[in-house]
Amino acid sequence: NWKLTVELIERAELTHIFEGKDPNYKEITFFAPPSLSILRYVWDKASGKEQFPGDPDRWRALSEDEKNHPEHLVQALDKDWCREMVLRHVIKGKHLKDEIAFRNRDYEIEAEEQTGGTDFTCESGNKLRAYREKTNYGGVTDAGAIFMYLYSFDAMEMVPLASPDIQPLNGVVHALNYNYVLGRI
C-alpha cells in the first residue's frame, strides 16, 4: 500500500519530482518506504516513545477519530521533516536492478575492501550502497533467486527490497520491505 507514501510526498511538496515536472529530475530512482513503515514510525513518535517530528500542538489538536486515520497523522508532520525524509530515498537518474553490481562475498558490504555494489548519494546527502546477491538453489551455488539490498552508511544498516524495478514514466521505484524503519536509510 502506497497511500501514506503519497501523503508524505504531498506533505513535502515534492509531487513535481515524482510527476517528472521538474527539469532537474527528468528521471529518478525512488527507494519507496511502504505505508506501514510510515504509519509505524508516526505512531511510535506520537505515542511518546521519541520526539514527534512535527508540531506537537497539531498532533494534540487531532481528535481521536482523526488519529485513527493515517492521512491525518502525516498532515501533522513538519513539512521540512517530510521533505528531508522523502529526499533520503531519492536518487537522480534511473537505476534498474540489473545495473546494480553484485556484492563481493569475500568482504562485508560496508568494508573498505568491498569492490562490489553500486554507491549512491541521495538527494538529502545520505550515502547508500545498492547491491545484488545470488542465492543457492537445490544445492547448486548461485542458481537461485537474485535479491537486491541497500546498505546505509549513515544508519549503518542493511535494508532489503521487496519489489525492485517498478517503472513509472519518469524513473524506477524499488519498494522497500515492510520491516523497513522510516529514516534508517
Which residues fall in each region the model found?
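Mature, structured domains of secreted/extracytosolic soluble proteins
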Residues: 1-185
